[in-house]
């Protein structure tokens, strides 16, 4: 059973982004096929304190050694065991602080300000940075958050074939009438935030739908999204097809637009979404690295103000209810711009 499912497509509202942030040089590398490489050694992106030597390379789950996989799962469990600090409603652990943060951003005075808005991708990039920072600072984690290469599994026809769904990792599908996950490192994990805006005790739920997940996450769907050359239509497509599709068809907790970070797989999924954005940005960095547009409030849940919708710009402030200091969209647009310092492997 799906919970509060991810919403309909957002409007294609575009605006010119401010240009006061540093832009990359144009000497990026291309392969013979014309596609930008996924290696993160391309000159021109690094700025501020980020250098090639300092940069973290995020890897696909299957590229981690068994020790690295265990270290990551141990760090996630550490957050689940640590007491909450945020003071947000219904929090019981540091991990639940992050779930409550995500839900809180869907319940502002302007309703949901992190989905169906221009800042959808920048805010979630910031959110991944918060998660990674807390894992390191509070659980002594020295690695990175891995991602799940969803298109690889969708194209193979076996959406749930990755070892990440194994009994020694995140566990697999839910079972029984409640779709509770009963294997893996987080078997029988109890959530207290959600479903939706409720605060109840319930199990970690999944309800896989392989056919629909494959249709939304395969290379045909991704190719369609990548046919868009500007941020708003590309972001809309990614948000509503591979992003929303995988959330919905993992089902259970992941299909709850408000409280989906209660499933640790959420962060693997959003690392992949972030990787898709970064690869798209690098295809044409002169035009895409700082390309931002779209409304800052969810038009489906608000009445248009007399002055029209405010569009996202590089100066728009991203907030986390003081879990980490606020930053701006401009600071997170370039993963190697100094505020952030990471790349992705070349799978």
Regions found by a protein language model. Name each.
Residues 1-31:
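Fungal secretory targeting signals
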Residues 19-347:
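Intrinsically disordered, flexible peripheral segments
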């Amino acid at each position: 059973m799906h919970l509060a499912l991810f919403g309909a497509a957002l409007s294609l509202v575009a605006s010119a982004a401010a240009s006061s942030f540093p832009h990359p040089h144009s000497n990026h590398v291309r392969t013979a096929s014309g596609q930008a490489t996924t290696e993160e050694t391309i000159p021109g992106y690094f700025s501020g304190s980020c250098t090639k030597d300092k940069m973290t390379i995020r890897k696909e789950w299957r590229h981690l050694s068994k020790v690295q996989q265990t270290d990551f799962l141990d760090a996630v469990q550490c957050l689940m065991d640590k007491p909450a600090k945020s003071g947000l409603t219904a929090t019981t652990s540091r991990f639940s602080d992050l779930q409550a943060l995500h839900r809180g951003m869907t319940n502002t005075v302007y309703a949901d300000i992190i989905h169906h808005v221009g800042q959808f991708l920048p805010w979630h990039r910031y959110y991944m940075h918060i998660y990674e920072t807390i894992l390191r600072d509070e659980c002594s984690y020295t690695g990175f958050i891995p991602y799940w290469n969803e298109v690889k599994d969708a194209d193979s026809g076996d959406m749930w074939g990755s070892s990440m769904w194994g009994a020694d990792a995140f566990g697999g599908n839910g079972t029984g009438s409640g779709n509770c996950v009963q294997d893996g490192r987080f078997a029988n994990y109890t959530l207290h935030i959600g479903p939706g805006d409720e605060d109840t005790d319930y199990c970690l739920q999944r309800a896989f739908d392989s056919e629909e997940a494959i249709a939304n996450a395969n290379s045909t769907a991704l190719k369609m999204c990548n046919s868009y050359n500007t941020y708003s239509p590309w972001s809309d497509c990614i948000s509503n097809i591979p992003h929303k599709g995988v959330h919905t068809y993992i089902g259970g907790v992941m299909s709850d637009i408000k409280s989906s970070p209660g499933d640790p797989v959420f962060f693997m999924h959003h690392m992949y979404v972030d990787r898709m954005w970064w690869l798209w940005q690098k295809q044409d960095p002169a035009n895409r690295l700082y390309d931002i547009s779209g409304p800052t409030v969810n038009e489906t849940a608000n009445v248009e103000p007399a002055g029209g919708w405010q569009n996202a710009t590089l100066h728009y402030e991203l907030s986390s209810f003081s879990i980490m200091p606020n930053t701006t969209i401009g600071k997170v647009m370039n993963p190697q711009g100094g505020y952030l310092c990471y790349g992705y492997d070349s799978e």
